[in-house]
Curated annotation (Swiss-Prot):
PANTHER family: DNA REPAIR PROTEIN RECO. It comes from the Bacteria. Involved in DNA repair and RecF pathway recombination. Gene3D superfamilies: Nucleic acid-binding proteins, Recombination protein O, C-terminal domain. It comes from Salmonella typhimurium (strain LT2 / SGSC1412 / ATCC 700720). Monomer. Belongs to the RecO family. One of its GO terms (cellular component) is bacterial nucleoid. This is DNA repair protein RecO. Signal peptide: none annotated.
Length: 242
């Protein structure tokens, strides 16, 4: 791919004494593995640009699995992520690295990713809504089609107060049992609309996306989730004094 295209670095690691091995997500080619020769040398002007969450324009060449980076320019400064939003950004980067095949085009997903990073950078509240919307978009692009609005058993529209159990590749079926794998009709409508007005619908969305993403991730845990658990401060619960 000799032409310029928009991209983000998902992950980088040292490669030889002066180079970097990059995992990048591009608009036209999807996920691509690149060697950035000399990027670690003192004279390189690429050091600051080849960082996660920095919008890039880049060119590369090569026919094998690992391509060679020819040029890269930062379109702007890195989007400002810190604390909980930084860990959230690292999570979606790792998610893409785990589930996307190399060199499969996902142009619409690229903009879903950009929108998610921008939402994380601009949020003053919880990052959870942005993460859930991105996960649902990713599942859709992977071909994971789900009908949230109709019961797969009866064909009728879901009812807010009824409970439904999800069966993989079949849909949601009415259930009299309530457990961690069931959802109310209200939850399903929130998932369809990608709108999560309260903690209850957010938790339901998280349960569903974890369930749906599990086959793509296999048994290997995400490192970013473990980092989040280790380094983010625990929330303290304030109690009223008598």
């Amino acid at each position: 791919m000799e032409g310029w295209q928009r991209a983000f670095v998902l992950h980088s690691r040292p490669w030889s004494e002066t180079s970097l091995m990059l995992d990048v997500f591009t608009e036209e080619s999807g996920r691509v593995r690149l060697v950035a020769k000399g990027a670690r040398s003192k004279r390189s002007n690429l050091k600051g640009a080849l960082q996660p969450f920095t919008p890039l324009l880049l060119r590369y060449s090569g026919r094998g699995e690992v391509k060679t980076l020819r040029s890269a320019e930062a379109v702007s400064l890195a989007l400002p992520l810190s604390g909980i939003t930084l860990y959230s950004g690292l999570y979606i980067n790792e998610l893409l690295s785990r589930v996307l095949e190399y060199e499969t085009r996902f142009s619409e997903l690229f903009f879903d990713y950009l929108n998610c990073i921008q939402a994380l950078a601009g949020t003053t509240g919880s990052p959870e809504p942005a993460l859930r919307r991105f996960e649902l978009a990713l599942l859709g692009h992977l071909g994971y089609g789900v009908n949230f609005t109709h019961c797969a058993g009866s064909g009728e529209r879901v009812d807010d107060t009824m409970t439904y159990r999800y069966r993989e590749e079949k849909g949601f079926f009415a259930s009299v049992v309530i457990d961690n794998n069931t959802f109310t009709g209200r939850h399903l409508k929130a998932l369809e609309a990608r709108e999560f007005p309260d903690v209850d619908t957010l938790r339901a969305a998280k349960r569903f996306t974890r369930m749906a993403l599990k086959p793509y991730l296999g048994g290997k845990p995400l490192k970013s989730r473990e980092l989040f658990r280790q380094f983010m401060p625990k929330r303290t619960v304030k109690t009223k004094k008598d």
